[in-house]
């Protein structure tokens, strides 16, 4: 508030929480409904008391195939929780699919806003058109993809927006899901040519797209510069084909999918060759990327050392660690993968059709991040 920023608390919803829990003994989700309602209602009251105008409950489990028991549990939970919202507004957010099994149940509850995924939700548009949308609620329409890095096609998106507005639906333009799944900004990418980056939209750029779409939706956009630029971009995408790759794919025969010799024969050959014990010992294939390993790779990337010096360092590391494995008596040795950085990026560099960024990091899990290559062509 001191910075002039209006924040919106976002927490995982009660229904998704109960559906993802693992239950032991005879108790099931319904046995915990009363306690969960009390906890969420208390949390909602605290958010509202602290000045939150909107509170968002994420309920991704609603896009699953739901039973009548699931729907009954969902209704029970939110009838209890929403009874305590007071002057606050509650947004129910869904993503990664549509809510075909419970659309009517959701819209009948006292939510102030409902977020629907219009991209991966194959039936979302159909559900809204066939059943309408309550006039007293706000539809948070997920029309800008929150999972991929590609620019939004304004022409297609504006058609959906106009169709919703024609039904007098109170619409807020939204991403299809959290922007956690995409890199932060294109501003950090200084080495990729514009012929590639002009097709990308990371998190900051997707917010800019939302702002542009909001503006375009309120005007005769067909002659607007932003719309025309976007239309031209999609009409002139560069050729991403690799004829050599396509030729190899076309030449694949059915027998190419059959590995020879047969498994039993390979198994016998390998057992004889390696003579491993019944339970062979080994380690994870990748050893820690220590400071000196990272320093060696960085020096090579900056051109501070030669390729031969880079390879010599890695070979020495491999030799040292093979010796350690032999000394402690491991049966299956690994070479430690000292030549690679992130696994996804490293193997992508061995293939055609990929682009590589400088700082387009995304979360893998927990605090671990990866910088995956971009699939551009064949």
Regions found by a protein language model. Give the residues of each.
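Domain-level signal for soluble alpha/beta catalytic cores
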Residues: 1-378
């Amino acid at each position: 508030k001191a910075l002039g920023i209006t924040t919106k608390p976002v927490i995982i919803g009660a229904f998704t929480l109960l559906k993802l829990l693992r239950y032991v003994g005879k108790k099931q989700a319904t046995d915990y409904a009363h306690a969960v309602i009390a906890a969420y209602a208390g949390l909602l009251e605290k958010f509202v008391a602290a000045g939150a105008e909107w509170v968002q409950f994420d309920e991704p489990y609603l896009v699953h195939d739901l039973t009548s028991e699931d729907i009954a549990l969902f209704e029970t939970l939110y009838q209890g929780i929403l009874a305590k919202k007071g002057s606050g507004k509650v947004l129910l957010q869904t993503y990664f699919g549509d809510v075909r099994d419970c659309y009517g149940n959701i819209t009948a509850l006292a939510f102030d806003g409902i977020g629907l995924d219009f991209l991966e939700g194959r039936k979302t548009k159909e559900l809204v058109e066939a059943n309408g949308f309550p006039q007293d609620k706000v539809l948070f329409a997920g029309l800008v993809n929150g999972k991929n890095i590609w620019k939004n096609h304004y022409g297609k998106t504006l058609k959906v927006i106009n169709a919703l507005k024609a039904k007098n639906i109170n619409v807020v333009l939204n991403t299809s899901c959290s922007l956690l799944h995409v890199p932060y900004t294109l501003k950090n990418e200084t080495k990729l040519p514009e012929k590639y980056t002009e097709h990308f939209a990371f998190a900051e750029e997707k917010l800019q797209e939302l702002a542009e779409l909001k503006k375009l939706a309120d005007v005769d956009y067909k002659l607007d510069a932003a719309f025309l630029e976007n239309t031209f971009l999609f009409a002139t995408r560069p050729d991403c084909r690799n004829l050599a790759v396509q030729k190899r794919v076309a030449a694949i025969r059915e027998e190419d999918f059959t590995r020879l010799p047969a498994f039993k024969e390979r198994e016998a050959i390998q057992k004889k060759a390696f003579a491993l014990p019944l339970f062979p010992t080994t380690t994870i294939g990748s050893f820690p990327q220590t400071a000196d390993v990272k320093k060696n790779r960085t020096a090579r990337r900056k051109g501070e050392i030669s390729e031969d010096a880079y390879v010599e360092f890695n070979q020495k590391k491999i030799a040292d660690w093979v010796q350690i494995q032999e000394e402690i008596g491991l049966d299956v040795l690994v070479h430690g993968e000292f030549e690679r950085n992130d696994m996804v990026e490293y193997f992508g560099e061995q293939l055609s059709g990929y682009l590589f960024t400088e700082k387009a990091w995304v979360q893998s899990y927990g605090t671990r991040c990866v910088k995956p290559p971009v699939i551009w062509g064949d």
